[in-house]
């Protein structure tokens, strides 16, 4: 524990010259008292609100059973710097004294909480996750689909949800600008909306990193020859806003005409169906040069690709046979 002297009165002029031993006695006594003053008896987390005074911070510490309000005030009065204390959530470690805590509050080294947005999460679920985080405050609308970069984001207790969303969207803007500048002539997309839309489809179609450019190549080829994309996730999006459907897709949903269903329309949907990650965006801006037009699941999370409809139909039958073995089909 660091020793600090708390002296609340000043000597009269000449007093130190006349009574040097009195001052020595006072100094020694102050050192002893400071040494005996206990630090925080436990680890704890405290929140210092915006605009809190030294006195209020001391009260918060005392209420938490960490250090007395008076010792904290005295530390700030006699030995603290002029730096203001900063709001936020702080980790107080066992043994920290008033001076340690004051320095921590002035440093602004708050606890950094994390909110994780996985690749392919739709905006409605991003909104739900942020609204469920009770350490954040404020209302927000559902962010525009495709505007959020999936990643882990740090925040502090009491921060606004709007501020967190703003960082997420700024991250997407930055990453997209970097990738767009490196796009290859082969890409099928002409602008940001098209790029994020196709990237969101790639994101939802495969979770295998090595397949992203291959899947992007398939869709690039289909767009080039005027074939419908026929991507199952585009059927689901109008039904659930991107949430898992939890059942088999209905025939009526496959045939539904809307702005997203790529079984019933040519070209790209009107906008993204999820928030794509950096790798999927990069894949559609630099798709694999291949001549595949079809792909179907293999049953292990990956896909098998085909150049012709005959090859594809054979692969589909293998997939159906596997599903029957698993009891997923009759």
Predicted segments with their positions:
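Extreme N-terminal basic, low-complexity initiation segments
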Residues: 2-6
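Bacterial N-terminal signal peptides
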Residues: 24-34
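Signal peptide-directed extracytoplasmic domains
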Residues: 37-181
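Bacterial extracytoplasmic/cell-wall-associated proteins, especially those involved in peptidoglycan
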Residues: 127-142, 146-330
